[in-house]
């Protein structure tokens, strides 16, 4: 009988302690619930914007992008074309000219999205890029691809697309700058031939 009473008391005390240990005592806040507004702000929604007039490939305002000594093309980005799309898009739009080794201009209107994390949570979008138009320099117009899609920027990007890997490092690493002036500064610091953070690349 005495043992039964002790057992009942032990169970009663244990239950009381368990009840007193609330979720707020855990290292993870299990009570937090994301609001619809927060979820909407986190989810990506592409902003529809008209393409700008096709620029002159030989005008001022183009910035030379350095990839590496073995990259045979001459990529340039039009600084005046840089813009950050409003939320919930947040991607960076720009115009590239990937000039061939024979001097042919290849203009593209593109966007790059910088994810906050390398891991997608829920509907969170991963880092990716998209081509919105190809430049027709003969007829001075953009040709929009029929099935343009955002292409994920994965671990193989550096090997398969060295140019956009440089743009990703310039725009995305360390967070997206607050304005276009910050984007221009990033390009000069990280993507130029004589970027301050890099040694001169001339042989």
From Swiss-Prot:
InterPro entries: CNP1-like_dom. This is Cryptic neisserial protein 1. Pfam families: CNP1. Its main location: periplasm. It is found in: Periplasm; Cytoplasm. GO terms for molecular function: peptidase activity. Residues 1-18 form the signal peptide. Keywords: Cytoplasm, Periplasm, Signal. GO terms for biological process: proteolysis. Belongs to the Cnp family. Was suggested to be clpB, but this protein is not that chaperone.
């Amino acid at each position: 009988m005495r043992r039964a009473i002790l057992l009942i008391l032990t169970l009663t005390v244990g239950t009381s302690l368990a009840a007193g240990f609330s979720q707020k005592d855990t290292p993870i806040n299990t009570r937090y619930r994301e609001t619809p507004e927060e979820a909407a702000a986190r989810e990506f929604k592409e902003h529809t914007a008209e393409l700008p007039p096709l620029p002159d490939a030989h005008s001022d305002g183009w910035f030379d992008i350095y990839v590496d000594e073995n990259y045979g093309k001459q990529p340039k980005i039009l600084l005046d074309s840089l813009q950050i799309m409003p939320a919930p898009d947040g991607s960076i739009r720009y115009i590239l000219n990937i000039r061939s080794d024979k001097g042919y201009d290849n203009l593209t209107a593109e966007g790059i999205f910088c994810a906050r994390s390398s891991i997608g949570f829920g509907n969170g979008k991963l880092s990716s890029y998209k081509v919105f138009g190809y430049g027709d320099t003969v007829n001075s117009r953009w040709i929009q691809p029929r099935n343009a899609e955002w292409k994920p920027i994965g671990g193989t990007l550096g090997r398969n697309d060295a140019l956009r890997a440089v743009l990703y490092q310039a725009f995305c690493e360390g967070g997206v700058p607050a304005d276009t002036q910050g984007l221009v500064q990033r390009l000069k610091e990280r993507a130029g031939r004589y970027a301050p953070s890099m040694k001169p690349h001339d042989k």
